């Protein structure tokens, strides 16, 4: 299976002679669960990856045959990272099948460093404007393109698909520099949000 977000029934796990394998888009044991790419970006991780592992009764807990790491760029969105991993991690499955045929045994996952990546719900991606700008940026990138981070202004919900944190040398209008948390400042081509 590939990026399967559920559990295979126990009675089916032993049906294939060599068991089941799954291609999972995280560096296990970090980010077990349904939304590993999104959760990695939201947490500010600097790297992600993919693992091919043997399925067991517990979610994403089986021993690992092969893995690969990719850096997460400072502007990378979940959609972009998913596309990259779908393209570059696929050969891991073919190599794993060759390993199984050759009798290679998978390596058990560490019991340390386990994190869970639950499915993303709309409430998980609501922007708290009192948060630090970097946290908001991670949230927006992790939720882009879907489900999309959102905020409310005048009782209207709107999605934000791209953000960029201002840096010390950036030139901005004085109204932007003094914006309070939650205050929006519009210029001709940009919209700025004051953060906590």
Which stretches of residues belong to each language-model region?
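Active-site-lining helix/loop region of Rossmann-like oxidoreductase modules
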Residues: 95-152, 159
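Sequence-level motif detector for i,i+2 pairs with an aromatic at +2
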Residues: 47, 61-62, 122-124, 155, ...
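Donor/substrate-binding cores of folate-linked one-carbon enzymes
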Residues: 3-116
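An anion-binding loop in the catalytic cleft
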Residues: 129-196
């Amino acid at each position: 299976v590939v990026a399967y977000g559920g559990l295979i029934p126990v009675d089916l796990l032993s049906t294939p002679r060599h068991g089941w394998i799954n291609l999972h888009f995280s560096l296990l044991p970090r980010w077990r669960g349904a939304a590993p790419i999104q959760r990695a970006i939201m947490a500010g991780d600097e790297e992600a990856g993919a693992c091919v592992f043997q399925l067991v009764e517990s979610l994403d807990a089986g021993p690992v045959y092969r893995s690969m790491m990719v850096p997460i760029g400072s502007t990378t969105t979940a959609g972009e990272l998913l596309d990259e991993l779908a393209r570059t991690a696929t050969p891991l499955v073919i190599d794993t099948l060759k390993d199984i045929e050759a009798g290679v045994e998978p390596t058990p996952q560490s019991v340390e460093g386990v994190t869970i990546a639950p499915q993303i719900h709309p409430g998980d991606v609501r922007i708290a404007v009192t948060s630090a700008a970097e946290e908001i940026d991670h949230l927006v990138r992790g939720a882009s393109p879907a489900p999309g981070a959102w905020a409310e202004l005048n009782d209207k919900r709107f999605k934000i698909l791209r953000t960029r944190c201002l840096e010390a040398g950036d030139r901005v209008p004085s109204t932007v520099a003094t914006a309070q948390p939650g205050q929006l400042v519009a210029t001709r081509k940009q919209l700025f949000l004051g953060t906590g």
